[in-house]
Curated annotation (Swiss-Prot):
Keyword Translocase set for record: no
Principal EC category: isomerase
Catalysis: reaction(s): alpha-D-glucose 6-phosphate = beta-D-fructose 6-phosphate
One GO term describing the cellular component: cytosol
Localisation: Cytoplasm
Function text: Catalyzes the reversible isomerization of glucose-6-phosphate to fructose-6-phosphate.
InterPro entries noted in UniProt: G6P_Isomerase, G6P_Isomerase_C, Phosphoglucose_isomerase_CS, SIS_dom_sf, SIS_PGI_1, SIS_PGI_2
Recorded GO MF terms: carbohydrate derivative binding; glucose-6-phosphate isomerase activity; monosaccharide binding
One Pfam family recorded for the sequence: PGI
Protein name: Glucose-6-phosphate isomerase
Pathway: Carbohydrate biosynthesis; gluconeogenesis; Carbohydrate degradation; glycolysis; D-glyceraldehyde 3-phosphate and glycerone phosphate from D-glucose: step 2/4
Similarity remark: Belongs to the GPI family.
Keywords from the UniProt entry: Cytoplasm, Gluconeogenesis, Glycolysis, Isomerase
Length: 549
């Protein structure tokens, strides 16, 4: 990968001038001037996904200039570097190969002179065998009963991805009940343990190093709870498995290392659901559906790595995001899935995007003077409409939104889905075109009211519109289409990081807080007043000690 400051390119300068021409152009004008706008600014993927980006403040010239930026920053070279196994995570000297985990073509992918695919396939096969034993009931707990509940203990990528996918694919789930514990707050593990039976529960401890503070604290609490019933430590092996690479620590915990599922340092945590970290997904929906998830992602990988940039969906969405973030000053993006099963999708890509591209230092080690990662947030529709859409429609912030919905629902109750989708379509239309003063006044006249007498209310009912959105319509949310959708967003994030000259695959920002917490923890062990920090931190710690006494 080349280290090119995007603001120093001629394409960036051209975009700055173009922004001056575009800043007052409205989406309504763009549609009025081009009857073929939807056809020009939308694309389908495998007849499974329609991406409509026509309701954006862009023209063909805008996209051409953004594509020039991608060329000048050598995006094509960056894509080749990632897929070829080059160590593009330079601060940790690691390759970035989540694409290898779903490489259904089995084409060799070389890291340090070694094809990684045989090991990837071996772990997949091991997960298949293990999961089939659990799901079939062949695997027995310490009293001879089959497993009924699975508790995944992890945090960050070891929790968010599997939790999001098992929820999104709930229509495909089997008889096993899944639980996820992440927070070191004891309430989280305590509430889950109230729901499960030690005789029929399997715990998955997801920590690459088997040293993650939150995960291991919860794992030891789960082990202690289990042993209160099981008694003999030899029974731990029948109820705990590890997603880790630290065989020594796994064995010391009491887990049979035959039930340790490894992954590699070229798998980043927030890109790890495709790896052994996805074992909870397999246990929830079955191995065949997990393979479909991998296959959908692999199909998007092929699209991303082979499709010309002008028709490449992750690249197009990434470029539009850069346009708003760096030229319009939009600091945020909302992800709004109109599907209740997808209720964790925004939270998943909140981590995926903000931990990846929330960087202020470029690949040369210099502070940037432009915008990098946006703030990502969102909730399912239509809940959000009754919560925060007010600000999106009439607030002072520009909030570009991604609306996501399936054409076919898994629960065709009455006319629920038509009502849901009517809102999905209506919101993007309302955000784009708004409602003028003239329309508001005409509505009053149609109701037999005199607009002049209601003059004081009219301004509050006007919608400026011109609020940008993308619409992603899936045929149906299946393991395959979900895999493709996740990979679409992953590659969008990678594209933005590559163009913005930052390292997308490290996360040093999480380290300082950990270090300070490790320093503070021993100070909380007694009731002595603390004076070793700033006055605020000292005051907080000392009040905590006073109140807990």
């Amino acid at each position: 990968m080349k280290n090119i400051n995007p603001t120093q390119t001629s394409a960036w300068q051209a975009l700055q001038k173009h922004y001056d021409e575009m800043k007052d152009v409205t989406i309504a004008e763009l549609f009025a001037n081009d009857s073929d706008r939807f056809a020009k600014f939308s694309a389908t993927f495998d007849d499974l996904m329609l991406v409509d980006f026509s309701k954006n403040r862009i023209t063909e010239e805008t996209l051409a200039k953004l594509q020039d930026l991608a060329k000048e920053t050598d995006l094509a070279g960056a894509i080749k570097s990632m897929f070829s196994g080059e160590k593009i995570n330079r601060t940790e000297d690691r390759a970035v190969l989540h694409v290898a985990l779903r490489n259904r073509s089995n084409t060799p992918i070389i890291v340090d002179g070694k094809d990684v695919m045989p090991e990837v396939n071996a772990v997949l096969e091991k997960m298949k065998t293990f999961s089939q034993a659990i799901i079939s009931g062949q695997w027995k707990g310490y009293t001879g009963k089959a497993i009924t509940d699975v508790v995944n203990i992890g945090i960050g990528g070891s929790d968010l991805g599997p939790f999001m996918v098992t929820e999104a694919l709930r229509p495909y789930k089997n008889h096993l009940t899944m639980h996820f514990v992440s927070n070191v707050d004891g309430t989280h593990i305590a509430e889950v343990l109230k729901k499960v039976n030690p005789e029929t529960t399997l715990f998955l401890v997801a920590s690459k190093t088997f040293t993650t503070q939150e995960t291991m604290t919860n794992a030891h609490s789960a082990r202690d709870w289990f042993l209160k019933s099981a008694g003999d430590e030899k029974h731990v092996a029948k109820h705990f498995a590890a997603l880790s690479t630290n065989a020594k620590a796994v064995g010391e915990f009491g887990i049979d290392t035959a039930n340790m599922f490894e992954f590699w340092d070229w798998v980043g945590g927030r890109y790890s659901l495709w790896s052994a970290i996805g074992l909870s997904i397999i246990l929830s929906v079955g191995f065949d559906n997990f393979v479909e998830l991998l296959s959908g992602a692999h199909a998007m990988d092929k699209h991303f790595s082979t499709t010309p940039a002008e028709k490449n969906l992750p690249i197009l969405l990434a470029l539009i995001g850069i346009w708003y973030n760096n030229f319009f000053g939009a600091e945020t993006e909302a992800i709004l899935p109109y599907d209740q099963y997808m209720h964790r999708f925004a939270a998943y890509f909140q981590q995926g995007n903000m931990e990846s591209n929330g960087k202020y230092v470029d690949r040369n080690g210099n502070a940037v003077d432009y915008q990098t990662g946006p703030i990502i947030w969102g909730e399912p529709g239509t809940n959000g409409q009754h919560a925060f859409y007010q600000l999106i429609h009439q607030g002072t912030k520009m909030v570009p939104c991604d609306f996501i919905a399936p054409a076919i629902t898994h629960n065709p109750l009455s006319d629920h889905h038509q009502k849901l989708l009517s809102n999905f379509f209506a919101q993007t239309e309302a955000l784009a075109f708004g409602k003028s003063r003239e329309v508001v006044e005409q509505e009053y006249r149609d109701q037999g009211k005199d607009p002049a007498q209601l003059e004081h209310v009219v301004p509050f009912k006007v919608f400026e519109g011109n609020r940008p959105t993308n619409s992603i319509l899936l045929r149906e949310i299946t393991p395959f289409s979900l895999g493709a959708l996740i990979a679409l967003y992953e590659h969008k994030i990678f594209t933005q990081g590559a163009i913005l000259n930052i390292f997308t695959f490290d996360q040093w920002g999480v380290e300082l807080g950990k270090q300070l917490a490790n320093r503070i923890l021993p100070e909380l062990g007694d009731d002595k007043a603390i004076s070793s920090h700033d006055s605020s931190t000292n005051g907080l710690i000392n009040r905590y000690k006073a109140w807990r006494a």
